[in-house]
A protein has these predicted regions:
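Interfacial juxtamembrane loops and adjacent helix segments
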Residues: 46-136, 296-303, 323-332
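Transmembrane alpha-helix segments characteristic
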Residues: 17, 166-168, 354-377
């Protein structure tokens, strides 16, 4: 049936599907959760309220994105101008302090950066939320333009094969990253449209020659694109190449190509040139980015920035397909690996296709300069490993992927296009399910499941625990234990209450804990639905360094942060659900572990002579090591640190005997005494431990590495102790 529909009707159907998906993505994502959306909102509000551009500075760049050109924000401010709302350029929503918990994992656990009230959802009783969504719908319009440009680019390169253009159009329309951009308040949406327009015009000029109208359109696309986001300027290379091509194709066309190219450049400069002049007059930097770049890069040298950029490439790959908001909403690895395999096949097919048309070469060049610009950005400003910086190259990328697949199956083009459209459409729905579940209120439960333990515990009339389930009754250090609690809210509270789950050992020390708002961040107690039971599963990770063997009591409660107290349940401050047997790992040292210090030293175990200590007393710490590739002697430091970061004991000294005298890969132990300050308050403390080289003691610490090689930090929380008088 699809083959009988005209290409234009199929294109219209894809466009309608895109709009529906973009709206769904927008409604699934609460206000301000998208990348830098709060800062883009502040920029638009600054323009609306002050009717002037914000000054360019480090502060305004960080808080308002003031280093970006103003076109998108001016349009958003204009569209929202009839709405009278209090939030201004200093608006700060209530923050979720537990946001980003194990952000790299697919889950719905504290993915929300902010706390959200019902007025942020349709039909938007909040003026701020309505302003956000009006700007998001502006982004959707720009996104639709990108989708149409993908179709146009396909028709330019393959005028006699509309199905290829439709395949590229569908691939762009249903790409979750583009859908997310087109459903968020951000200037990338405008930059993507104008950039993709510039690519299409450049390809048309290279393929069919230049006209005055094409030169004007290309100049407008480049100028408006740069006035949306400066990164679009890299596409001027593709535009210049198009004019060089038509000039070189025939000698008598040089003057003609130069004239049209100059017209294009003058229009672009007339539209966007004033922005660079303003920046230069204000900061001495035409881009207005020098101080902002320095603030982001900090003291990192170029070599470190390059290492960070290279380590961020796997992350960047995931953002090409679907990684939402600040990267915390992620899909299973298999999704990204599947697209990787499909891209390899496309590249093989593309090599066989041997595209040599002028338009194809210009499209290739547009992709190349976009990637080069992105690479330069990644090694200049950290945290820019996101494909939103090259979205304007997506139509060209999609087109070449479809061409590659077609080359492998030339006789199956109609079926191939249908499969491409269907696969990408299903992937967009699959990705939407992860976005939606990250912020959705927990589902209501009519009855407890059979494996849950019924219980009745009332927390001062705010809520009741009606059941629970523990994933295990025995665990080792480093293991994860899931604690599922079935809550029945009884009433909304005046202030948000926090849930805590503590694993308390026989010494009264909290060996592991989770703190979160109910609903894993999405069911704040101020918005609870009374008498609607829901399940919360708290993933509690027992530290690798947890002392074992031990018996851990699982205690759950509600904490009122405004009053700094727990809610009483019965006659206690928490409800004990059960106990877990924490067993020792197998190893040749006490509390076996494998803590990697820069592949130089491995901490394989430790022991304390006691874990409950009085102020002024001495604690004996024995650490067990394996010297893997020591490059010097090392200075070890052990600090007893309170919850507020204050240090109450310091035991810093060179490890003896000197490590350079140790046999390679031989196990050795070292003991040090830690004297607690006499005025140390009672409570629980963390024993922090780390290493530095003797030649630079206390200056450059050895970095702790994870199993996959990424840096964790420059010290570890070795143990928990209690101070009692």
């Amino acid at each position: 049936m699809l083959t009988r529909l005209s290409p234009h009707r199929l294109a219209a159907a894809i466009a309608v599907a895109f709009i529906a998906l973009a709206l769904a993505y927008g409604f699934a994502n609460p206000p301000f959760e998208a990348t830098d959306e709060i800062r883009h909102f502040r920029y638009a509000r600054y323009l609306a309220l002050n009717r002037a551009l914000p000054p360019v500075s480090v502060e305004t760049s960080k808080e308002l994105q003031a280093h970006h050109p103003p076109l998108y924000y001016a349009l958003a401010a204009l569209l929202a101008s009839p709405i009278h709302s209090d939030p201004g350029p200093d608006h700060s929503p209530a923050i979720n302090p537990f946001w980003g918990f194990r952000y790299f994992e697919p889950s719905a656990d504290n993915k929300n950066q902010y706390l959200h009230a019902p007025d942020g959802r349709w039909p938007f009783s909040s003026g701020a939320a309505l302003i956000v969504f009006i700007a998001r719908w502006l982004s959707t319009v720009f996104g639709l333009g990108v989708v149409l440009m993908a179709y146009r680019l396909g028709r330019i390169l393959f005028p006699d094969q509309p199905r290829i253009a439709l395949g590229a159009m569908a691939f762009v329309a249903f790409n979750p990253t583009l859908l997310h951009s087109a459903s968020s308040l951000n200037n990338d949406a405008a930059a993507t449209f104008f950039g993709s327009w510039a690519v299409a015009e450049s390809a048309a000029i290279a393929q069919g020659g230049s006209t005055r109208a094409r030169a004007i359109r290309l100049g407008m696309a480049l100028g408006l694109g740069v006035l949306s986001k400066v990164s679009v300027a890299v596409l001027a290379v593709a535009a210049a190449a198009a004019y060089l091509w038509i000039g070189a194709s025939r000698k008598d066309r040089w003057r003609w190509a130069f004239g049209h190219g100059a017209l294009c450049a003058m229009i672009a400069i007339a539209i966007a040139g004033w922005w660079f002049a303003r920046n230069y007059l204000q900061t001495g930097d035409p881009m207005g980015l020098s101080e902002y770049q320095s603030a982001w890069a900090g003291e990192a040298d170029r070599a470190r920035l390059i290492r960070e950029a290279l380590s961020g490439l796997p992350y960047a790959w995931t953002t090409v397909w679907a990684r939402f908001d600040y990267g915390q909403i992620v899909l299973p690895d298999g999704a990204y690996q599947t697209w990787g395999v499909l891209c390899v096949f496309a590249l093989i097919g593309l090599a066989r296709a041997r595209l040599r048309s002028p338009a194809a070469l210009i499209a290739f060049l547009a992709i190349a300069v976009s990637l080069a610009g992105w690479a330069a950005l990644m090694i200049t400003i950290p945290a820019t490993a996101h494909a939103r910086h090259i979205l304007f190259a997506f139509p060209a990328l999609a087109l070449f992927l479809v061409v590659g697949w077609r080359s492998l199956l030339p006789q199956r083009l109609p079926a191939l296009i249908f499969v491409v459209c269907s696969l990408e459409f299903l992937f967009s729905l699959f990705s939407l399910s992860y976005l939606d579940s990250a912020f959705a209120y927990p589902h209501a439960i009519a009855a407890l499941p059979a494996d849950a333990t019924p219980i009745s515990a009332n927390f001062e009339g705010a809520a009741e625990i009606v059941g629970y389930r523990l994933s295990t009754r025995a665990a080792h250090s480093g293991d994860r234990v899931d604690v599922t609690v079935y809550w029945r809210p009884l009433a909304q509270t005046a202030t948000p209450l926090q849930t805590f789950v503590h694993f308390v050992d026989s010494q009264g020390i909290i060996a592991a804990q989770r703190d979160t708002y109910p609903g894993l961040g999405s069911a704040v107690t101020t918005t609870w639905i009374a008498n609607q039971t829901f399940a919360d599963t708290y993933r509690v990770f027992i530290p690798d360094t947890a002392y074992a063997p031990e018996t851990l009591a699982v205690r759950v409660g509600l904490w009122n942060a405004s009053e700094s107290r727990p809610l009483i349940v019965g006659d206690a401050d928490a409800l004990t659900l059960g106990r877990i047997d924490l067993q020792s790992r197998v190893g040749g040292a006490p509390n076996p572990m494998a803590i990697n210090f820069e592949n130089r030293m491995a901490l394989i175990g430790y022991a304390l002579d006691r874990r409950v200590i009085a102020p002024g007393d001495t604690l004996l710490l024995t650490t067990h090591w394996r010297a893997a590739a020591a490059d010097s002697d090392y200075w070890a430091y052990a600090h007893v640190v309170g919850a507020d970061g204050q240090i109450w004991a310091i035991a810093d000294s060179i490890i003896t005997p000197p490590i350079t005298e140790w046999p390679v890969n031989a196990n050795q132990s070292e003991a040090r005494r830690i004297v607690l300050a006499p005025d140390t308050p009672t409570g629980q403390y963390t024993l922090e431990f780390g290493l530095t080289r003797v030649s630079d003691a206390g200056q450059t610490r050895l970095v702790v590495l994870a199993d996959d090689g990424h840096e964790i930090g420059d010290h570890i929380a070795l143990a928990q102790i209690r101070v009692e008088r």
